Amino acid sequence: MKGTVLDQILSDKNLNVAYQRVYQNQGMPGVDKMTVFALKGYLQRNGEKLKNLIRQQQFKPQPVLRIERSKGKGDVRLLGIPTAVDRLVQQAIYQVISPMFEKQFHDHSYGYRPNKSCEMAVMTSLEILNDGYVWVVDIDLETFFDLINHDKLMGIVSRTIKETAVATLIKKYLVSGVTIKGRFHQTTRGVAQVPIKSVIK
């Protein structure tokens, strides 16, 4: 795949793969109530317009729909549901930039990474225990994603992503806001947890 990073993101091949992934994952509709089943028709009618808006940096992501899901024992977990269009764009971004960041991650980082799994994390832990290490640190990252500093995150992103248009698009997703019980809330920090892999893992 040649061209700029943005060209790669908006290539027909990349967008088609992104569409297939979003369609397979399905999931709930976002704030606009568009299902993934309606996405194909929407893209047939508006695909070129969508690409042009992104190229001209005029595309505006919709707020993420926040819903509560029971974790059992009275605990609830807040989930973020982007619109089908935003899931498509996020997936298209992810497919292109993920390999750029993948080589920077620690080999024993297993969350949301290609060719990594929970089972591999357990096996590595057992190997470490068998090597004689006996201390285990259990860290709960429950609120981590809600507290991420946008400027620091974008500083890290910009070390690898040099194109202003792509960095700006990612930043727009960070500040697109959330809708909770019909009310819009600005997002000045944090990253909404989405049902697809996060753009920056």
Question: Where would I find each of the regions flagged by the language model?
Answer:
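Short, Φ-rich (hydrophobic/aromatic) sequence segments
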Residues: 46-51, 89-93, 97, 170
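Glycine-/proline-rich flexible loop or hinge segments
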Residues: 24-37, 70-79, 106-108
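Non-catalytic, polymerase-adjacent accessory regions of viral genome-replication enzymes
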Residues: 1-44, 48
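Conserved polymerase palm-domain catalytic core
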Residues: 53-54, 60-67, 72, 107-108, ...
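Short alpha-helical scaffolding segments that buttress acidic/His motifs in well-ordered protein cores
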Residues: 18-22, 92, 169-174
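Amphipathic alpha-helical interaction elements
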Residues: 7, 24, 28, 98, ...
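Conserved pre-motif C helix in the palm subdomain of viral-like polymerases
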Residues: 76-105, 187-201
